[in-house]
Design a protein with these regions (language model features):
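Short, mixed-charge low-complexity intrinsically disordered segments
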Residues: 39-70
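Absolute protein N-terminus
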Residues: 1-2, 70
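A short, charged, amphipathic alpha-helix used as a generic interaction element across diverse proteins
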Residues: 26-44
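N-terminal acidic leader/helix
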Residues: 2-32
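Intrinsic disorder/low-complexity segments enriched in polar/small residues
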Residues: 16, 20-21, 35, 61, ...
């Protein structure tokens, strides 16, 4: 399985699919996801999209689930 797509489900049930090719700091997202899923304390993370103005942030209080998808 290629691990190049991550599904984020927010507490308001909004779902976002993040692909490695669309985010500059995808590895930081993967590290954040692993820490989050292990129950560790995680800081806010700003993800930088490849398109101008496509940045977004995630934090522990607004994410319900985060996982790799096929």
């Amino acid at each position: 399985m290629t691990k190049d797509r991550v599904r984020i489900v927010y507490r308001n049930n909004y779902e976002r699919i993040v692909e490695e090719s669309n985010v500059r700091n995808f590895n930081a997202l993967v590290e954040w996801m692993e820490d989050f899923n292990e129950g560790n304390l995680v800081p806010s993370l700003v993800l930088f999209g490849r398109d101008l103005g496509s940045n977004f942030s995630i934090n522990k209080s607004n994410v319900k689930t985060i996982e790799f998808i096929d």
